[in-house]
Regions:
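Bacterial N-terminal signal peptides
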Residues: 1-6
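Terminal processing/anchoring signals of secreted or surface-associated proteins
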Residues: 76, 101, 283-287, 303, ...
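Predominantly extracellular beta-rich ligand-binding scaffolds that present long acidic/polar faces
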Residues: 10-281
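C-terminal tail/sorting-segment detector
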Residues: 313-324
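Extracellular Ig-like/FN3 beta-sandwich strand-entry sites
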Residues: 309-311
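Residue-level detector of functionally pivotal "anchor" positions at catalytic/ligand-binding pockets or at interdomain
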Residues: 279-302
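Short aromatic-centered micro-motifs
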Residues: 69, 298-299, 314
Length: 324
């Protein structure tokens, strides 16, 4: 093991392969500073991290992140509040790989290009694999803000973004939004495979199932959407629309697993990535405590009011919970 001093004067441990080991909010800040000098730096998360009110994001417009970040099934909790474009834990990526990471928390912005994992993808071939977004994302811009449950925007000829085996549980409040990628522009390519979204979107005038596109190119394979209001039909994409009954009966988990030898998807209340079920059957959703019941109106994932005896995933006071 080695200790490396970053620009923030916090020493980050590295393993024998040179991966930076990220286990605290201070490590996150220090790694962001390292990326500003060495954009191809690789990292492994070693613990769940709550950033609190820390506004640090990795990658800048001038120096996008280009390395491999492995969350190792850990959770990153964010609370970003910004007044400028491009927001996500990874603000800009170009030729990066992000895998096995669960992001939850809050993103509030008065502008656009907000994503649960990534703000903007301007170049390179990029990979997001086995990740989960449970972020509450709100943009007050009022139009053309391009908010995505995973990525805000993807742009430029030759830019490729692959999203494989990912689960979107985001709650989005924005006028123009999509389950996975807010917008892809001008000959960029977005490919979404073996993925599921149970995201919700409020205040949307343009909400699409996978992504919006303007002269971009995209493919969608074996990807399922619970809430699909494709209101921007000339520039939208289609996944397979499913019902809560299908999510509950295990058939979609089987379809997502797709006869692979390695177990990637398992069945819980909804299909779940296996890596997030290893410890304490973690689903990324809190359970409602019967001893401390919530006081708001309770809805199912189709937006229909349900009683307090309803079992499964519910939305109450703008948050998703599990009632067992």
């Amino acid at each position: 093991m080695a200790l490396v001093a970053s620009l923030s004067a916090v020493a980050i441990e590295q393993d024998n392969d040179g991966n930076y080991l990220i286990g605290t909010a201070s490590d996150w800040d220090a790694f962001a500073a390292i990326v500003a000098e060495t954009p191809g730096a690789n990292a492994l998360m070693t613990a769940d991290i709550d950033l609190g009110d820390d506004q640090t994001m990795i990658g800048t417009e001038a120096v996008p992140y280009q390395g491999t970040f492995d969350g190792q099934a850990h959770q990153l909790t964010v609370n970003y509040s910004v007044t400028e474009d491009y927001v996500g834990p990874f603000r800009f990526i170009s030729g990066a790989t992000i895998q096995k990471l669960h992001v939850e928390g809050i993103i509030n912005t008065t502008r656009g290009f907000a994503g649960g994992l990534v703000g903007y993808v301007p170049a390179g071939t990029n990979q997001i694999s086995q990740c989960m977004s449970s972020v509450n994302i709100t943009s007050t811009q009022g139009g053309r803000e391009w908010v995505g449950g995973f990525v805000g925007g993807c742009n430029n000829s030759g830019t490729v973004l692959n999203i494989d085996d990912c689960l979107c549980q985001a709650n989005i409040t924005a006028a123009w939004a999509a389950n996975f990628v807010g917008i892809m522009y001008y000959s960029s390519h977005v490919n979404v495979n073996n993925s599921l979204s149970v995201a919700t979107c409020a205040n949307a005038t343009q909400f699409n199932s996978i992504y919006h596109y303007i002269y971009g190119h995209g493919t969608t394979r074996n990807t399922y959407i619970l809430n699909c209001t494709v209101s921007y039909t000339d520039h939208g994409s289609a996944g397979t629309v499913v019902t809560m009954d299908q999510l509950a009966d295990g058939s979609i988990a089987t379809a997502l697993q797709a006869d692979r030898t390695e177990e990637v998807w398992v069945h819980d209340e909804i299909p779940m990535l296996k890596i997030f079920m290893e410890d304490n059957s973690h689903t990324g959703l809190a359970e409602i405590d019967a001893a401390q019941p919530k006081s708001g109106i309770r809805y199912n994932l189709m937006g229909q009011p349900v009683g307090k005896d309803y079992k499964g995933i519910v939305i109450e006071n703008g948050q998703k919970f599990i009632v067992r």
